[in-house]
Regions:
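A residue-level marker of the well-folded mature domains of exported/periplasmic proteins
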Residues: 2-9, 18-153
Length: 153
């Protein structure tokens, strides 16, 4: 349930970023990391629902954690002339060349959940996992009365 809510929140942020200054988008290509995880399944569903609501064409491709496939999918989006590419990178460094090529073609790029390293994008929508870990640690400490042992598996 939490993951579905998070996916909706993330996509709401993505939708807002897309609609800010590019409301006339004719097409969006989304390359997601996987569909083997409930988070990404929910994210894809939320994206499709929002695109339908906004009347925007959306093509979702699934990289299946394969960088070569993701790069080919992004290349396909560039060839099709989409206005926006949303990507959850398989490899934060490996997607740099594809993002650069998309940007040179005038396509806005938004990264979701996983940031791209060493390249600026239109927007990054994600969580602060470090802060989340700190909050989880604080909750565990409170739950055991600030003393005891905790194992993370």
């Amino acid at each position: 349930m939490f993951r579905k809510s998070l996916a909706r929140i993330l996509f709401s942020g993505v939708a807002l970023a897309m609609l800010s200054g590019i409301a006339a988008a004719e097409g969006i290509g989304a390359s997601l990391l996987t569909q083997q995880h409930p988070f990404y399944i929910s994210l894809a569903e939320a994206m499709k629902k929002q695109a339908t609501t906004e009347g925007v064409a959306l093509e979702v491709s699934i990289a299946n954690q394969d960088l070569s496939k993701q790069l080919a999918d992004v290349e396909d989006f560039i060839t099709k002339g989409v206005d926006v590419i949303i990507i959850s990178p398989v490899d934060s460094k490996g997607v740099r060349s594809a993002i650069t090529k998309a940007q040179k073609a005038g396509i806005k790029v938004i990264t979701v959940d996983v940031p791209a390293n060493n390249i600026d994008v239109t927007s990054f929508v994600g969580t602060d996992n470090f802060a989340g870990g700190e909050k989880a640690g604080q909750l565990m400490a409170t739950s055991i009365g600030d003393k005891g042992n905790v194992a993370v598996i």
